[in-house]
């Protein structure tokens, strides 16, 4: 395949074995943040779920008490043993498509949106990493909390090559698993369909199910997309994002990328984190999860299920 781009650190293309083995608006100074010693992470004993709640008007619902929530595993109610509506520190991964079809204004608008997201819309307590991808994913920088080098790294990108979305997600998930913060989210920005991955969506699904990260996609679906790219597949992106509790947002103009990333940041800034003790801990099996608000008109997005870690699992 033609084309490479110069960045400091490279990641080999994701492969099926990897995938199968892996299974905000700007923050105000008054925003409460959960202290770093509060560990809100899943373990063999406790399953932790992050949830986004919207009211009947579609607005983010904030300030709901624990008593307003109900949780179910495999259709059976479970008692909520951990709960916070305060902002829990976030580990964010960002995947930026730099295939040939992103040339020109698209890549410039995308770079500006990414830079604003990372430098202005995250909290000082958050950490982030960025991968760029065409027919293979490349790590621009690993986990960091400071803005140093972000602008320069993005500015060196040059769109070329084809699009390997599944490989990029497969390469990002291990970083999310080793995140230095409690919550996890992955944001994908792309203007095309996958044309070059070594793995398939089928190969990627086990890794997505095992991950507790909210996955978001911003699909650039501009009129008259160049013939060099297959049109972005919104249904495929939605299949990837929806099961995680995330979503896919479509923009018709790259000038709207900043609004789209701000909407995602706003969600990440107003989430609930809930935990419960599974009735069947450590069995290594898949279990469905449902989170609901007992009051009328509220809609909850959370991951659809999880694979329980075995008690002898060393991960």
Locations of the language-model features?
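Scaffold/interface architecture of coatomer-like assemblies
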Residues: 27-315
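Compositionally biased regions
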Residues: 3, 16-17, 29, 43
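N-terminal secretory signal peptides that target proteins for export/translocation
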Residues: 1-11
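Bacterial N-terminal signal peptides
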Residues: 12-28
